[in-house]
Each structure stands twice: as structure tokens, then as C-alpha cells.
């Protein structure tokens, strides 16, 4: 399972959706990046594959960052998101 996480202005908690396949997650990640670059559309609606009825619409101008990472069941959590100097 892959998580696409959005950091929003003035919000301590991120908004996230999940995709089962890396290619699908990468497509959502690129879609969000393009919206950030262009500033269009004003609203972006995302849905989640894990929770089928989960949908979220965000104001593109309020997105600060987007990240993509793999969630692993074996470790009971997920890989540490973001960047780390540890190997």
C-alpha cells in the first residue's frame, strides 16, 4: 500500500489517501504536483482505495507539500516519511 500525504497550511495534521499499486500512487503524486505548479484547478478531489467511501477535496492554494511513501504491514507501520540522513 502506498500513501500520498498532503501537508496543508496552518494544519498540524496531514491529509492522506492510499493506493494499492505504485504506478497509481505515482500518478496521484504527479497530479498533485501539476496542480501546485499551475495553481489550477482551484479545488482538487482525491479518493482513497483502502477506504472506498473516503473522499477529500482540498483548496490547491492551501497545499504546502506532497509526499509519497510505502506503507508496510510487516513492520506494523510505515517507512519513515520525508528525508533522513540515516542509512
From Swiss-Prot:
It comes from the Bacteria. InterPro entries: UPF0367. HAMAP family: UPF0367. Belongs to the UPF0367 family. This is UPF0367 protein P9303_26451. It comes from Prochlorococcus marinus (strain MIT 9303). The lineage of its organism: Bacteria, Bacillati, Cyanobacteriota, Cyanophyceae, Synechococcales.
Amino acid at each position: 500500500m502506498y500513501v500520498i500525504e498532503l501537508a496543508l497550511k496552518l494544519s498540524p495534521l496531514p491529509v492522506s489517501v492510499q493506493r494499492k499499486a505504485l504506478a497509481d500512487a505515482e500518478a496521484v503524486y504527479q497530479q498533485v504536483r501539476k496542480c501546485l505548479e499551475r495553481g489550477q484547478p482551484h479545488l482538487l478531489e482525491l479518493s482513497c482505495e483502502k477506504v472506498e467511501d473516503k473522499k477529500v477535496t482540498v483548496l490547491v492554494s492551501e497545499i504546502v507539500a506532497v509526499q509519497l511513501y510505502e506503507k508496510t504491514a510487516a513492520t506494523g507501520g510505515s517507512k519513515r516519511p520525508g528525508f533522513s540522513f540515516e542509512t
